[in-house]
Each structure stands twice: as C-alpha cells, then as structure tokens.
Amino acid sequence: MSDPQGDAPQLTHFVGGQPRMVDVSAKAPTTRTARAEAWVLLPPESRAALLAGQTPKGDPLSVARLAGLAGSKRTADLIFLCHPIPVTSAEVDVTLKDAGIHITALVKTTAPTGVEMEALTAVTVAALNVYDMLKATSKAIEVSGVRLLSKTGGKSGDYQAAERPPQP
C-alpha cells in the first residue's frame, strides 16, 4: 500500500511505530489455496540410516507428515501478526529423492485472508522434525529451499513460482 502522497509505502501492520493485526473484518471470505516446498539435504550417513531403517527415533517421513499438518493449523500461534483462519484442507507430502527429502504442502481455506503462511509453516515444521529425528546420524543435515510455489484467491490474485531444478 502507498500513502496518499505516493512518497513511501504505508506499513499495514504498524501504526505509530507499534505492531498491530490488520483488520480483515470487512473482507468477504473467499476460497484460497497455497502450495509450498522445503528440502532436507542429507549427508550420505543420514541417507544410509534412513534407507536401512536404522533411524534412532523411528520413521522421520511419517512423523514429518503429521508435524506438517499440525504446523499448518498452529501458524497463528507461531507467526505473531498472522490471523487465525480455518484450515479447511491440508496435505503434506514427504518424499525421499536423490537430492534429499522433498516436502510439499497444499493448504486450503475459505477466509478473508490467505493461507501462504500456513503452507510455509507446514513445510518448515515438517523439515525441522526430519532434522530432529535424523540429527543423531549427522549434524550436517540442511533444511533448504523453503518457498511458496503457488497461491490462488484473494485481492492480490494468483501466483506461480518459477520452476527451478531440485536441490543439489
């Protein structure tokens, strides 16, 4: 948003230098979706332990799916200026690839504000749970490539991220 003079952007979440949650009560609820991704890059010893089923804390892929679903529903507790919204659907996919573990989330709502933060939180929480469950195998595990892939709905319209190759 810009100020009436067109000089500088107007901060929507700060008034008089103080943070606030933007009032969305006048906005009509609309259907909105967001898809996000993250990567967990595995050193050889972590990948070997995962493939051999010798991970100290159990199956990190199953736990990551559940953690991502929970993360999508708890976003407003973690992101201070994020509105609590009804998550009407959430899917978290956790797949072992050559480059590491690829995590995607698709989150949907019918609300006056979007679900981008819920999708990003889902993949981030899932990735952190993978790290936690595999950290005994190596401290060189990396969480990488967290990004919004797409969104639909809302005043700002649809968004589609540029394609890029999988993480190294």
UniProtKB/Swiss-Prot annotation:
It catalyses: (8S)-3',8-cyclo-7,8-dihydroguanosine 5'-triphosphate = cyclic pyranopterin phosphate + diphosphate. The active site is at D132. Substrate binds at L81, C82, H83, M117, E118. It is an enzyme of class 4 (lyase). Keywords: Lyase, Molybdenum cofactor biosynthesis. Pfam families: MoaC. GO terms for biological process: Mo-molybdopterin cofactor biosynthetic process. Pathway: Cofactor biosynthesis; molybdopterin biosynthesis. One of its GO terms (molecular function) is cyclic pyranopterin monophosphate synthase activity. Its EC number is 4.6.1.17. It comes from the Bacteria. Belongs to the MoaC family. PANTHER family: MOLYBDOPTERIN COFACTOR SYNTHESIS PROTEIN A. Homohexamer; trimer of dimers. Catalyzes the conversion of (8S)-3',8-cyclo-7,8-dihydroguanosine 5'-triphosphate to cyclic pyranopterin monophosphate (cPMP). NCBIfam families: moaC, PRK09364.1. This is Cyclic pyranopterin monophosphate synthase. The lineage of its organism: Bacteria, Thermotogati, Deinococcota, Deinococci, Deinococcales. The gene is moaC.
